[in-house]
Regions:
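Anionic, Ser/Thr-rich low-complexity intrinsically disordered regions
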Residues: 1-69
Length: 69
């Protein structure tokens, strides 16, 4: 039976997953730009995804600091 994921492991996984989503969205924006399609909505979504990534990274850092104390 697999061990339960710790809060720190889960936060690290969430960071990695969100980084992958951001990369995919960046690729979508770039492809749309190359094809001459509007990118306003895709760029707005990318900005929101970046904000979420920042928040998740902050949470991970707080967990790491708590663990070190």
């Amino acid at each position: 039976m697999a061990e339960a994921e710790t809060a720190l492991q889960m936060a690290a996984r969430h960071v990695a997953e969100q980084e992958a989503r951001v990369r995919e969205q960046e690729e979508l924006v770039a492809r749309s730009q190359r094809e001459g399609r509007p990118t306003d909505q895709a760029e707005g979504m990318l900005a929101e995804m970046g904000n979420m990534l920042d928040a998740i990274r902050d949470h991970l850092e707080r967990l790491r600091q708590t663990r070190e104390e």
